[in-house]
């Protein structure tokens, strides 16, 4: 399954329709306009009421209003709501991410495990790597990796099926999402590669300097259990691969043969690409879901100057190649790669090397360029393994995506995965075929297939 399928994105626009209002004592009223905000769990109200005094609001004198915070198709395992805390003339906006309210959706997409992982990121991993950088003298956002949303509260109780992550609304600081339907351009790609290099460098340095402190973040691939078990997930993978093959031209004999060969051992390949031990001693903590809906940009005179990464629900300890291939093959097209593929890798490695120097290490020891090139050959096919899921979704308008809760309910009743979420529609078939064909061709061209 595409990693996006296990994530919730901060939306391009809010579906502002209704609000549910509560005061500091929990008294509620609902205002109906068109589509009503559902009844939200008590633990979310409690978390916000706990946060409000810390943010300077007076106990009993503030109100909390809720609005929708994400759009259809933004993610399987989480729902986003916008909370506005008000007192007098003061209004503060927060984004609240919680597991799906629908029981079937929460169960079928393993929401609680994903939230536990993301809470670990905001509660422990990010504070730890920020502290580590500062201890090494890397203090400025311009010099290191500090580019994540401010998190005010992160909690997960898997037994109680409760979790909430309260973050800043980046739009209030003029951050914007890249339109997922557009191919990323050079400036945005270079900015992402720069910060990805910094993120990976921190892993390489910290596991050398503080191995015991770093150890809790060596999380395995979250998809391994589904890959090992017979069932709808495996059937869906085969269906996606067949869709790629069907998009190839009849004369694409080499491409067809390579994909048919991949189909024979695709489950083993997906697991192999996620095995950290095969990448050691060069494995890193990867973001795991590096596509444009999980990053936002701030601009100056139309030029992207700052990037923020979010949605860490599938973070894992793995080869650095995974994040690279995920972004390059899902967010760019054949034309971009012909022009800039090698330059993107160069930008990434230069940034990683510079960051390691700041952390008082040497890239030639911790990740030599020759080793990176070798790992690209070993793990590079991850580009098509993720592209076969994400490319059709990136070519599909949100209003054409199927209903996630209906999908989950059907899975509960039939134990079969409705494959329609990853299918193309009549309106996007041509765009999908062009993009996925170039992914296959480029994976072959670079020696990854």
Feature map (PLM): residue ranges:
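Low-complexity, intrinsically disordered regulatory regions enriched for serine/threonine
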Residues: 4-25
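Generic recognition of stable, solvent-exposed alpha-helical segments in well-folded globular domains
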Residues: 117, 187, 191-194, 239, ...
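Active-site activation/catalytic loop segments of kinase-like enzymes and analogous catalytic loops
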Residues: 120, 124, 314-359, 383-406, ...
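Active-site acidic catalytic loop and adjacent metal/ATP-binding pocket
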Residues: 72-87, 95, 263-320
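ATP-dependent phospho-/nucleotidyl transfer catalytic cores
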Residues: 10, 23-25, 171-287, 296-302, ...
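Plant-skewed but cross-kingdom recognition/interaction modules and surfaces
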Residues: 262-266, 306, 345, 359-366
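Conserved ATP-binding subdomain of kinase catalytic cores across diverse folds
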Residues: 67-242, 316, 320-321, 336, ...
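Juxta-kinase regulatory segment immediately upstream of eukaryotic protein kinase catalytic domains
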Residues: 11-12, 24-69
């Amino acid at each position: 399954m595409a990693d996006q399928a296990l994530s919730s994105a901060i939306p391009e626009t809010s579906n502002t329709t209704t609000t549910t209002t509560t005061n500091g004592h929990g008294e509620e009223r609902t205002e109906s306009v068109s589509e009503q905000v559902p009844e939200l769990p008590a633990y979310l109200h409690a978390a916000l009421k706990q946060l409000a005094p810390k943010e300077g609001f007076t106990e009993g004198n503030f109100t909390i209003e809720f609005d929708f915070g994400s759009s259809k198709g933004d993610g399987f395992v989480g729902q986003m709501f916008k909370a506005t805390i008000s007192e007098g003339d003061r209004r503060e906006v927060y984004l609240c991410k919680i597991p799906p309210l629908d029981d079937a959706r929460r169960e079928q997409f393993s929401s609680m495990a994903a939230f536990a992982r993301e809470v670990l990121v905001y509660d422990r991993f990010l504070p730890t790597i920020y502290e580590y950088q500062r201890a090494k003298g890397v203090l400025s956002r311009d010099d290191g990796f500090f580019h994540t949303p401010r998190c005010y509260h992160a909690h997960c109780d898997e037994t109680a099926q409760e979790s909430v992550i309260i973050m800043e609304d980046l739009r209030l600081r003029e951050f914007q999402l890249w339109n997922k339907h557009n191919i990323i351009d050079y400036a945005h790609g270079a900015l992402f590669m720069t910060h990805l290099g910094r993120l990976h460098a921190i892993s390489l340095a910290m596991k050398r300097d503080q191995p015991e402190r770093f150890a809790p973040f060596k999380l395995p691939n979250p998809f391994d259990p589904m890959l090992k078990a017979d069932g709808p997930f495996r059937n869906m993978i085969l269906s996606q691969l067949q869709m790629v093959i069907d998009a190839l031209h009849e004369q694409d004999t080499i491409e067809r043969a390579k994909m048919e060969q991949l189909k024979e051992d695709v489950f083993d390949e997906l697991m192999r690409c996620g095995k950290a031990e095969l990448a050691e001693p060069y494995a890193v903590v990867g973001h795991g879901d590096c596509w444009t809906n999980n990053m936002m940009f701030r601009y100056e005179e139309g030029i992207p100057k700052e990037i923020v990464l979010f949605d860490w629900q599938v973070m894992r300890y793995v080869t650095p190649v995974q994040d690279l291939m995920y972004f390059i093959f899902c967010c760019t097209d054949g034309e971009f790669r012909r022009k800039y593929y090698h330059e993107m890798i160069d930008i990434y490695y230069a940034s990683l090397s510079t960051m390691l120097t700041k952390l008082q290490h040497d890239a030639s020891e911790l990740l030599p360029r020759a080793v990176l090139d070798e790992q690209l050959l070993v793990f590079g096919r991850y580009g098509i393994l993720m592209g076969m899921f994400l490319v059709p979704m990136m070519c599909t308008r949100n209003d054409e995506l199927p209903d996630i809760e209906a999908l989950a309910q059907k899975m509960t009743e039939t134990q079969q995965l409705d494959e329609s979420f990853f299918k193309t529609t009549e309106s996007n078939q041509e765009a999908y075929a062009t993009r996925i064909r170039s992914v296959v061709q480029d994976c072959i061209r670079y020696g990854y297939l």
